């Protein structure tokens, strides 16, 4: 009976340890995914910033050309 008790405690302890390790790995994976999402969001913001900046420059150049043509 004592042998069975010790075996049961050992199995429960090992199960608890493995569960703890799995939960820790799961949290690490979730943190990595959140970090990747944040990096992708930053890249998208930078891309939109560049696109809008270039579009603004192009529009300003066109307006300047139209104004210059009207003055001639």
UniProtKB/Swiss-Prot annotation:
Residues 1-22 form the signal peptide. It is found in: Secreted. Expressed by the skin glands. The keyword Secreted applies. Keywords: Amidation, Amphibian defense peptide, Antibiotic, Antimicrobial, Cleavage on pair of basic residues, Secreted, Signal. One of its GO terms (biological process) is defense response to bacterium. It comes from the Eukaryota. GO terms for cellular component: extracellular region. InterPro entries: Frog_antimicrobial_propeptide, FSAP. Its main location: secreted. The keyword Signal applies. Residues 23-43, 71-72 form a propeptide. The modification Glutamine amide is found at residue 69. Belongs to the frog skin active peptide (FSAP) family. Dermaseptin subfamily. Possesses a potent antimicrobial activity against Gram-positive and Gram-negative bacteria. Probably acts by disturbing membrane functions with its amphipathic structure. This is Dermaseptin-B6. It comes from Phyllomedusa bicolor (Two-colored leaf frog).
